[in-house]
Design a protein with these regions (language model features):
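Active-site Tyr-X1-5-Lys
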Residues: 55-58, 69-92, 120-121
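C-terminal substrate-binding subdomain of Rossmann-fold SDR/epimerase-dehydratase oxidoreductases
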Residues: 119-123, 127-186
Length: 186
């Protein structure tokens, strides 16, 4: 294979805390093993998470030069795996914002999906830390980013890129207002 794009993993802090050994084995050790098997000509495009930034800074958005300070096992395994990948000469890493979009197996633990579920079920929402910001990216934009990386690999290689939508860097309160447009009885 010319390109290796590892997408398997245990995703999210709650699941990784519940299945610690599996999280380390799948999110970190499997990536380490995969990188060790690559030929010098092969190229790897890795998908990390913006969870590696931890809580970040309240004054500014995190960029690729922001310090990595993961606060969960999930974030730590992804950061450590990225370090391994980026030691490989032919590598690119995307630090993904929270991915959203239709799935056959919807994750109701994700903030956006959880807010929609609660609003449909309970017809009301109690918002904790309403000014907390999250950045989002649609799954089709992630796919477009990976395709772009394949076609522009030599220009992008050996670098890390945040992949998210500027317009989707919103507070919980702003998110609830958007949900309210579609769920009238909220």
């Amino acid at each position: 294979f010319d390109y290796v794009i590892p997408l398997a993993g245990l995703v999210g802090a709650p699941l990784c805390e519940k299945r610690k050994k599996d999280a380390i084995e799948i999110n970190l050790n499997a990536v380490k093993d995969l990188v060790s098997m690559l030929s010098k000509k092969q190229r790897i495009i890795f998908t990390n998470s913006n969870s590696g930034y931890g809580i970040g800074s309240k004054q500014k958005f995190c960029d690729e030069n922001s310090p990595l300070n993961p606060i969960s096992l999930y974030g730590r395994t992804k950061v450590d795996a990225e370090k391994i990948v980026m030691k490989f000469k032919n590598s690119i890493s995307f630090r993904l914002a929270t991915v959203f979009g239709y799935s056959y197996r919807m994750r109701t633990d994700l903030l956006l999906n959880n807010l929609v579920l609660l609003s449909l079920r309970d017809k009301k929402l109690d918002i904790f830390e309403s000014n907390f910001r999250r950045n989002f990216v649609h799954v089709s934009d992630v796919c477009d980013g990976i395709i772009y990386a394949i076609y522009n690999f030599s220009k992008l290689k050996s670098n890390v890129y945040n992949l998210g939508m500027s317009k989707a860097n919103i507070t919980k309160f702003e998110m609830v207002k958007k949900i309210k447009k579609y769920i009238k009885k909220l």
